[in-house]
Amino acid sequence: MSKIFVNPSAIRAGLADLEMAEETVDLINRNIEDNQAHLQGEPIEVDNLPEDMGRLHLDDGKSPNHGEIAKVGEGKYREDFQMDEGEDPSFLFQSYLENVGVQIVRQMRSGERFLKIWSQTVEEIISYVAVNFPNPPGKSSEDKSTQTTGRELKKETTPTPSQRESQSSKARMAAQIASGPPALEWSATNEEDDLSVEAEIAHQIAESFSKKYKFPSRSSGILLYNFEQLKMNLDDIVKEAKNVPGVTRLAHDGSKLPLRCVLGWVALANSKKFQLLVESDKLSKIMQDDLNRYTSC
């Protein structure tokens, strides 16, 4: 009976991706709670109710439409200040995120790349937030800050429309940061901090960790070498690989990396045995050819 062995480095890379996704979901949930902070204020005093609530009054019951006025006022009050649990946007959004997480796990088990899955998921989450959490229209300050204690009027605590707009955009910003900056805005600073790029590099290296690549030997022969012979931690290999020109951009785009060039680069910097066995002049030409071929695709 055959057994399937999973490389520990691949597991670590996958766990790092899942932790990054969980942190993004937590950040989005916190922003949703901030956006709904104005729904959790203190009870509004009767003397400071909105103008449309003035229709609720006591009389002798002779008015034929007294019941209708009361029902209209009561219904509008419930619409403004109460929300059913089934209609709570945060409750529905939590269920949506749970389904998204299950879908991500299924896609990763089927062999799809995490960077591709996450970029698609981010777009779906942004669309969901934009549709289900639109910015509320601006209201007058009298409708939001009519709370008093004794004779003193409390200070305005409800965020302005511009503040609410910036808060609602935090979810989009968090999701965009987690998936990496757009290709047109790619810069060296982003390359150093983009965890999704490191995860993609680690994933591709882990897949070919034991594969042997051909290098020119000093003895006019062929030198076979692989990542295992480096005797290095996968995280250290990834950090060194990011210094190879063009590798971070390829990883960001989800393209295939020139792994032979990456291996040669890392081995020249960290393996004395490799330095003694390889023909450095021919190696430089091979590495440059690999880079040109992969970056031009």
UniProtKB/Swiss-Prot annotation:
Database matches in InterPro entries: PP_M1-like (IPR004259), PP_M1_C (IPR037199), RABV_P-like_C (IPR049506)
Impact after mutating residue 69 to M: In strain: Isolate SAD Bern, Isolate SAD Bern original var 1, Isolate SAD Bern original var 2, Isolate SAD Bern original var 3, Isolate SAD Bern original var 4 and Isolate SAD Bern original var 5
Mod. after translation: Phosphorylated by host PKC and by an unknown kinase.
Chain intervals for the UniProt region annotation (DYNLL1 and DYNLL2 binding): 138-172
Record's keyword terms, sorted: Chaperone, Cytoplasmic inwards viral transport, Host cytoplasm, Host nucleus, Host-virus interaction, Inhibition of host innate immune response by virus, Inhibition of host interferon signaling pathway by virus, Inhibition of host STAT1 by virus, Inhibition of host STAT2 by virus, Inhibition of host TBK1 by virus, Inhibition of host TLR pathway by virus, Interferon antiviral system evasion, Microtubular inwards viral transport, Phosphoprotein, Viral immunoevasion, Viral RNA replication, Virion, Virus entry into host cell
Intervals of motif Nuclear export signal: 49-58
Cellular component per GO, a single term: host cell
Compositionally biased spans, kind Polar residues: 158-170
Record region (Disordered): 132-175
Motif (Nuclear localization signal): 211-214
Recorded superkingdom: Viruses
Signal peptide: none
Residue stretches of biased makeup (Basic and acidic residues): 140-157
Any one GO MF annotation of this record: RNA-directed RNA polymerase activity
Short name of one Pfam family: PP_M1
Outcome, altering residue 156 to G: In strain: Isolate SAD Bern, Isolate SAD Bern original var 1, Isolate SAD Bern original var 2, Isolate SAD Bern original var 3, Isolate SAD Bern original var 4 and Isolate SAD Bern original var 5
Modified residues (Phosphoserine): 63, 162, 210, 271
GO terms (BP aspect): microtubule-dependent intracellular transport of viral material towards nucleus; symbiont entry into host cell; symbiont-mediated suppression of host cytoplasmic pattern recognition receptor signaling pathway via inhibition of TBK1 activity; symbiont-mediated suppression of host JAK-STAT cascade via inhibition of STAT1 activity; symbiont-mediated suppression of host JAK-STAT cascade via inhibition of STAT2 activity; symbiont-mediated suppression of host toll-like receptor signaling pathway; symbiont-mediated suppression of host transcription; symbiont-mediated suppression of host type I interferon-mediated signaling pathway
Sequence similarity: Belongs to the lyssavirus protein P family.
Function description: Non catalytic polymerase cofactor and regulatory protein that plays a role in viral transcription and replication. Stabilizes the RNA polymerase L to the N-RNA template and binds the soluble protein N, preventing it from encapsidating non-genomic RNA. Also inhibits host IFN-alpha and IFN-beta signaling by binding and retaining phosphorylated STAT1 in the cytoplasm or by inhibiting the DNA binding of STAT1 in the nucleus. Might be involved, through interaction with host dynein, in intracellular microtubule-dependent virus transport of incoming virus from the synapse toward the cell body.
Stated name of the protein: Phosphoprotein
Organism: Rabies virus (strain SAD B19)
Gene behind the chain: P
